[in-house]
């Protein structure tokens, strides 16, 4: 069995994102991060009050976050994804960082809403609109444009986000373009800077050589390996994302993840009923693993 899994590319072969020259953001981002207004005191109080509930499913190792996509501003599709997450048994929903989309999502579900961006300033209006969690991640659309993020850039984005939003639950994705040792090192630094959750990814360059179940396992191998390695280096929860299915989601929990993130398996479907069924299938697949690992004798599985 042969699997073609892309290895991290050198800086000479891939463009490195310059934060003040980002073609995918709607405005120029200053590399010095000019002073931005902080959220109102009522927003800070709300975030502090909700932290425990947002993190509970991660602590129970049963979190399931359904992702609509960082660049997905299609209200109809986002509404379908949010509805599927709500009705299918997910614990969180992740949408693009847009205040109006947050208002739409919170009108459809009581699940914690996470917003994704690579611009810390964009988080503020989304959080004030009702988002309870922010994510520096969902880099797929950038990779498609040949843009990758360095460890230093991710670390700086994390520092600035934590400065602007000291109370918000903060998840940060470790880029798969880094080698595993560098992913682990970055995760440790992110934990020191106040990240609450580390998310792993597998990228879109894993091409299974087999179909069916074998192919699903091959596709998930990179992010499963990252979740295994990172979860043993940090004390905060790890979320495993990219290329997961009902077959491989339980493997992520056994590997050490506290939850899984699922995007294209759901948001690429054309029918909300099919979306709900897919979310339910993944949620049901997680239940036995979460229950087993919550038992006192389940500790042996994480060695």
Regions found by a protein language model. Give the residues of each.
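Alpha/beta enzyme core
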Residues: 2-7, 20-41, 46-240, 244-303
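Short N-terminal leader segment in a subset of presequences, especially plant chloroplast
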Residues: 8-17
């Amino acid at each position: 069995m042969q699997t073609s899994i892309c290895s991290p590319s050198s800086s000479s072969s891939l463009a490195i994102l310059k934060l003040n020259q980002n073609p995918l953001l709607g405005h120029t981002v200053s590399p010095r991060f000019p002073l931005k207004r902080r959220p109102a005191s009522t927003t800070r109080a709300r975030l502090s009050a909700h932290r425990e509930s947002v993190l509970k499913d991660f602590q129970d190792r049963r979190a399931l976050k359904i992702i609509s996509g960082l660049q997905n501003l299609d209200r109809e599709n986002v509404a379908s994804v949010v509805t599927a997450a709500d009705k299918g048994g997910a614990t969180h929903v992740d949408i693009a960082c847009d205040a109006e989309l947050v208002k739409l999502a919170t009108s459809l579900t009581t699940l914690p809403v996470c917003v994704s961006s690579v611009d810390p300033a964009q988080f503020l209006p989304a959080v004030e609109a009702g988002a309870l969690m922010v994510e520096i991640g969902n880099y797929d659309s950038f990779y498609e444009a040949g843009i990758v993020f360095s460890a230093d850039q991710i670390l700086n984005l994390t520092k600035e986000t934590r400065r602007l939003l000291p109370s918000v639950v903060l998840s940060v994705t470790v880029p798969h373009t880094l080698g595993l040792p560098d992913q682990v090192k970055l995760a440790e630094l992110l934990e020191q800077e106040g990240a609450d959750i580390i998310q792993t990814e597998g990228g879109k360059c894993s091409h299974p050589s087999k179909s069916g179940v074998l192919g699903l396992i091959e596709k998930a191998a990179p992010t499963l390996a990252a979740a295994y390695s990172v979860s043993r280096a940090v004390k905060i929860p790890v979320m495993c994302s990219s290329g997961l299915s009902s077959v491989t989601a339980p493997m992520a929990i056994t590997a050490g993840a506290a939850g899984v993130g699922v995007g294209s398996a759901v948001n690429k479907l054309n029918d909300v009923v099919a979306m709900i069924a897919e979310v339910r299938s993944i949620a049901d697949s997680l239940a036995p693993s979460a229950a087993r690992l919550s038992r006192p004798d389940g500790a042996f599985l994480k060695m």
